[in-house]
């Protein structure tokens, strides 16, 4: 306690409360002073996610379409399941804080090709309908948007970046559809149309699907890298799993009640 007390002179007009694992107070300095919690909230998000989603939870990303032999007749739908660590092989090599425990988007392309697909007569359509379309938390400053977090969506590859494009698109689902199109073309699949966005009908067959690593591995990436995108998407998944609403507010409400 004496050692911790010496830290008081290093803390300005802020608030600090230290407790042990049993919830017993060790040190307090203006504990009732409201302050912005910042990234410490990620610990709470991780804790509630493990309770609501469970440690065995995995994110699913799938492709849907009408397959006729080696051809997808019409559009191929790339359907996002909220996976915040869905990345191409190249992306972690260019990140300041490389994504680890990621889900390989190339593995989905390989799974599709393994079914015999050689061409798509339409376009790759990005479907982000699992979550809402709120790209940023309204209170975020302009210095944080696009760089530290967002734009957000249930379908994001490489944090919404298209490899080779220095400008991050406003629509992460469109960026994901473009990235997946590029990957398919590089693997020898002919794609006739330009990438776009839309919603897959429930009666369109699932052709291939991939899963992320188990939730604790995703949360490890979030906490180690202090990954804002991962935290925001995990919060939306908490909302979706709790009340079928993939929104920030639904996720926050679930956290309050847990």
Question: What annotation goes with each model-predicted range?
Answer:
Residues 50-53, 98-101, 119, 164-172:
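Active-site loop and adjoining helix of the penicillin-binding protein/serine DD-peptidase-beta-lactamase fold
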Residues 161-258:
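A small/polar active-site loop signature that marks catalytic segments
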Residues 51-66, 188-197:
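Short, well-structured active-site flanking segments
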Residues 12-14, 30-32, 38-41, 56-60, ...:
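Extracytoplasmic
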Residues 29-31, 75-81, 135-142, 202-215:
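Charged, often glycine-rich, active-site loop that binds/positions anionic groups
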Residues 37-55, 124, 155, 179-184, ...:
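Active-site SXXK
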Residues 14-15, 71-153, 160, 188-189, ...:
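Mid-domain, small-residue-enriched loop/turn segments at the edges of structured enzyme/sensor domains
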Residues 1-34, 55-56, 60, 107-117:
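Beta-lactamase-like hydrolase cores
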């Amino acid at each position: 306690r004496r050692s911790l007390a010496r830290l008081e002179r290093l803390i300005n007009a802020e608030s600090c409360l230290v407790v042990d694992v049993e919830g017993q107070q060790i040190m307090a300095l203006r504990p009732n002073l409201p302050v912005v919690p910042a990234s410490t909230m990620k610990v709470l998000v991780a804790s509630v996610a493990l309770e609501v989603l469970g440690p065995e939870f995995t994110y699913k990303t799938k492709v849907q379409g009408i397959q006729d032999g080696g051809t997808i007749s019409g559009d191929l739908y790339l359907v996002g399941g909220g996976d915040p660590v869905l990345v191409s092989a190249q992306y972690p090599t260019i990140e300041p804080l490389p994504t680890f425990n990621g889900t390989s988007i190339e593995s989905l392309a390989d799974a599709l090709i393994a079914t015999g697909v050689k061409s798509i007569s339409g376009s790759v359509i990005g479907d982000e309908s699992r979550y809402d379309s709120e790209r940023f938390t309204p209170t975020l400053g302009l210095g944080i948007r696009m760089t530290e977090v967002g734009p957000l969506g249930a379908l994001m590859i490489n944090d919404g970046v298209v490899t080779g494009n220095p400008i991050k698109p406003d629509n992460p689902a469109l960026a994901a559809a473009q990235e997946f199109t590029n990957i398919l073309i590089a693997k020898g699949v002919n794609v006739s149309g330009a990438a776009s966005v839309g919603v897959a009908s429930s009666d369109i067959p699932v052709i291939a699907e991939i899963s992320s690593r188990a939730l604790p591995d995703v949360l490890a990436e979030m906490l180690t890298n202090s990954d804002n995108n991962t935290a925001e998407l995990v919060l939306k998944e908490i909302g979706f799993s709790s009340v079928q609403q993939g929104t920030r507010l639904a996720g926050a409400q679930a956290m309050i009640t847990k």
